[in-house]
Amino acid sequence: MAKKISIVVSVYNEELGLTQFYDHTSPILKDACANAGWDYELIFVNDGSRDASLDLLKGFAAADDHVIVVNFAANRGHEAAMIAGIDIATGDGIVCMDADLQHPPEAIPDIIAKFDEGYDVISMVRTEREDAGIFKKVTSAAFYKVMNQMSKANFENNSSDFFGISRRVALVLKKDYRERVRFLRGYVQNVGFKKTTLEFKASARVAGESNYNLKALVKLSLNAICNFSDAPLKMGIYAGMVSLAFSFILIIYSIVQFFLGNAPDGYSTLVVLISFMFGVLFIILGFISEYLAIIFAEVKNRPIYIVDSIITKNGEERNE
């Protein structure tokens, strides 16, 4: 029996570029699998889109037996959509990618080749991004540097949600990595097994705008930090030590100035110290709140996603 590759695509309000993605990706996938002797399935996960994305996906499924559409009951987020796709995928190898063509389908033959070589994890690393400004490049580089410093895990610079995993890695993710607050690319980077890296150039979006605004990126960053590091919880200890040392120096300085007859203005010093301490304390409190929110989400044990329906061959739809 031929091996199968599952392509998982998260979709949220992508109607403007969805047809272009399908028309571009489908023949590349078909040719790559024919050359490698693999079968394939193309899994679209509709993450509660409010536009015509679902109608387009139903059309793809009706015309193409390889297309499967997983329709969420409500928007659950990009990572939940990828997890759902991984859960339902039946392939020996699974590739997650976005629907905006920033993740090039042309890389699929190389990914299949790596699966044939026995790799379990194929990490896709961006070497260039056409629509990324200086701010995004700097903050992205800083994020991965901070993550590698704060945690024992290893994060490749410019890694993305474009990756390939083997069937056994998918089963590990399905069984053991079911956190309600998660950082999927971090799990993939650090799950272990035989791993390799491929590079790609991220093109500009084919249409529409990115669904990742600044708020979403900040949330993703906080999730990553809190999932892979306990360093923020230790900030209070370090901040206390620094504050104690600073206070000791200030006391010595004040005593010396007093005996020299140059007593410092106590009000200004007090305002600066209080402002500094409150700033540090609120940062620490914010991180503690994030950890508590994660614990709260885990205790509630609510589902990561809820599937409304699955559309398979010839447009057949079944409710879940």
Task: Give the residues covered by each predicted segment.
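N-proximal low-complexity "stem/linker" segments adjacent to membrane-targeting elements
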Residues: 1-27, 31, 35-38, 317
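Hydrophobic helical membrane-anchoring modules
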Residues: 2-4, 185-320
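Conserved donor nucleotide-binding strand/loop of the catalytic core
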Residues: 33, 40-43, 54-88
